[in-house]
């Protein structure tokens, strides 16, 4: 009975520590922490901590999402470092200790591709035309001389151009309803382990 009480008290302390973990971060950093979790890992702490995009995702997000006033507070002198320290604390519980010790933000890349074309044909004064938007063009025109004095002149031309369209894609894990669910699950696992020992 005494061992059960100690286990319950330990679980309560772990739950309180987990709840205080995210409370030390501003709201912008909290969303960065939850949005940086790789979708393929779910709530598996070891998987999250061994995924290289996790730490860089948190650091980069905090640098982009949090204003200077939220990066500078009495409790945390520089929030990206605090976010990295937060991730290091969580990962250490899963036995992962080779985490980066400073924030980083890799440059983002964008790709642009697309095509558009324009063609025109004119014969004996009638004209048909098909258009798409264009930014630059090259044209080729050929003229065929008439074969008899009564045959019309035919001119054909084609214009081809390329247009650009930009697509940005952002991926990340869905925000969980309860941000501290991973730490609470860890506390529950610890409680279960203590219960099995009894």
From Swiss-Prot:
<keyword id="KW-1003">Cell membrane</keyword>
<feature type="glycosylation site" description="N-linked (GlcNAc...) asparagine">
    <location>
        <position position="107"/>
    </location>
</feature>
<feature type="signal peptide">
    <location>
        <begin position="1"/>
        <end position="19"/>
    </location>
</feature>
<feature type="lipid moiety-binding region" description="GPI-anchor amidated glycine">
    <location>
        <position position="172"/>
    </location>
</feature>
<dbReference type="GO" id="GO:0005886">
    <property type="term" value="C:plasma membrane"/>
</dbReference>
<protein>
    <recommendedName>
        <fullName>GPI-anchored hemophore cfmC</fullName>
    </recommendedName>
</protein>
<feature type="disulfide bond">
    <location>
        <begin position="32"/>
        <end position="61"/>
    </location>
</feature>
<dbReference type="GO" id="GO:0009277">
    <property type="term" value="C:fungal-type cell wall"/>
</dbReference>
<keyword id="KW-0732">Signal</keyword>
<feature type="glycosylation site" description="N-linked (GlcNAc...) asparagine">
    <location>
        <position position="131"/>
    </location>
</feature>
<feature type="region of interest" description="Disordered">
    <location>
        <begin position="99"/>
        <end position="168"/>
    </location>
</feature>
<feature type="binding site" description="axial binding residue">
    <location>
        <position position="44"/>
    </location>
    <ligand>
        <name>heme</name>
    </ligand>
</feature>
<dbReference type="GO" id="GO:0046872">
    <property type="term" value="F:metal ion binding"/>
</dbReference>
<dbReference type="InterPro" id="IPR051735">
    <property type="entry name" value="CFEM_domain"/>
</dbReference>
<feature type="disulfide bond">
    <location>
        <begin position="41"/>
        <end position="47"/>
    </location>
</feature>
<dbReference type="InterPro" id="IPR008427">
    <property type="entry name" value="Extracellular_membr_CFEM_dom"/>
</dbReference>
<dbReference type="Pfam" id="PF05730">
    <property type="entry name" value="CFEM"/>
</dbReference>
<feature type="compositionally biased region" description="Low complexity">
    <location>
        <begin position="108"/>
        <end position="168"/>
    </location>
</feature>
<keyword id="KW-0964">Secreted</keyword>
<feature type="disulfide bond">
    <location>
        <begin position="49"/>
        <end position="91"/>
    </location>
</feature>
<comment type="similarity">
    <text>Belongs to the RBT5 family.</text>
</comment>
<comment type="function">
    <text>GPI-anchored cell wall protein involved in stabilizing the cell wall. Not implicated in virulence, heme uptake, and biofilm formation.</text>
</comment>
<keyword id="KW-0449">Lipoprotein</keyword>
<keyword id="KW-0479">Metal-binding</keyword>
<keyword id="KW-0349">Heme</keyword>
<keyword id="KW-1015">Disulfide bond</keyword>
<dbReference type="GO" id="GO:0098552">
    <property type="term" value="C:side of membrane"/>
</dbReference>
<keyword id="KW-0472">Membrane</keyword>
<keyword id="KW-0325">Glycoprotein</keyword>
<feature type="domain" description="CFEM">
    <location>
        <begin position="20"/>
        <end position="119"/>
    </location>
</feature>
<keyword id="KW-0408">Iron</keyword>
<dbReference type="GO" id="GO:0005576">
    <property type="term" value="C:extracellular region"/>
</dbReference>
<keyword id="KW-0336">GPI-anchor</keyword>
<keyword id="KW-0134">Cell wall</keyword>
<feature type="propeptide" description="Removed in mature form">
    <location>
        <begin position="173"/>
        <end position="198"/>
    </location>
</feature>
<feature type="glycosylation site" description="N-linked (GlcNAc...) asparagine">
    <location>
        <position position="168"/>
    </location>
</feature>
<feature type="disulfide bond">
    <location>
        <begin position="28"/>
        <end position="66"/>
    </location>
</feature>
């Amino acid at each position: 009975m005494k061992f059960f009480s100690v286990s319950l008290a330990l679980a309560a302390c772990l739950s309180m520590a987990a709840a205080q973990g995210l409370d030390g971060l501003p709201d912008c950093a909290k969303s960065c922490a939850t949005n940086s979790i790789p979708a393929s890992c779910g709530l598996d702490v070891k998987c999250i901590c061994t995924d290289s995009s996790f730490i860089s995702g948190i650091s980069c997000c905090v640098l982009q999402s949090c204003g200077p006033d939220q990066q500078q507070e009495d409790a945390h002198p520089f929030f990206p470092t605090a976010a990295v320290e937060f991730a290091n604390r969580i990962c250490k519980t899963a036995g992962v200790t080779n985490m980066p010790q400073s924030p980083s933000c890799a440059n983002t890349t964008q790709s642009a591709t697309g095509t558009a074309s324009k063609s025109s044909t004119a014969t004996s004064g009638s004209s048909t035309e098909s258009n798409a938007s264009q930014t630059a063009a090259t044209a080729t025109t050929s003229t065929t001389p008439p074969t008899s004095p009564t045959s019309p002149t035919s001119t054909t031309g084609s214009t081809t151009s390329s247009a650009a369209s930009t697509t940005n894609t952002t991926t990340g894990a869905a925000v969980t309803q309860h941000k501290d669910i991973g730490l609470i699950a860890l506390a529950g696992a610890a409680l279960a382990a203590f219960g099995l020992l009894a």
